[in-house]
């Protein structure tokens, strides 16, 4: 009997759009200095990623942007999500997408989640567990949580830097 397929979640990529945020870029530049090959792997959404998946016997990845210290703008998130969305159709049997969202802007986060799910077929979003020390339990986030519920998609809450 063949082993079951290996499906991985929390498989990050790095978009230069979100990386243009100084706080995010600073954190990643430091990591890139100390982990050889990390930058090229995180920026690759095609052949290198597929080779690594094959080597690890990974059948399918749900890809999301890496943690985003600071607060990415709505436009940076749109651009990063569009970058990921361009890669997914080329490998539909291997990739799915989780959106990166501008959680400092709850209304825009709800809109971007809806756009990513309806236009790009994303299966949810990965969000940091707070944005600049602010958590998502206030009334201003009700619209966001309602949108996720209405769309029936997963919201993966990822630990991030303090």
Located regions from the model:
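Helix-coil boundary/capping segments in enzymes
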Residues: 1-162
């Amino acid at each position: 009997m063949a082993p079951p397929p290996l499906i991985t979640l929390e498989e990050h990529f790095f978009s230069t759009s979100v990386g243009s945020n100084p706080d995010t870029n600073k954190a990643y530049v430091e990591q890139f200095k100390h982990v050889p090959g990390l930058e090229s792997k995180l920026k690759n959404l095609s052949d290198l990623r597929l080779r690594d998946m094959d080597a690890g016997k990974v059948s399918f990845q749900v890809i999301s942007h890496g943690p985003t210290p600071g607060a990415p703008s709505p436009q940076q998130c749109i651009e990063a999500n569009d970058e990921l969305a361009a890669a997914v159709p080329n490998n539909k049997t291997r990739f799915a997408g989780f959106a990166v969202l501008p959680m400092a802007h709850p209304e825009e986060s709800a809109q971007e989640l809806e756009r990513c799910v309806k236009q790009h077929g994303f299966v949810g979003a990965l969000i940091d567990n707070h944005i600049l020390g602010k958590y998502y339990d206030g009334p201003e986030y009700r619209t966001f949580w309602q949108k996720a519920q209405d769309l029936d998609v997963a919201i993966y809450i990822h630990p991030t830097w303090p």
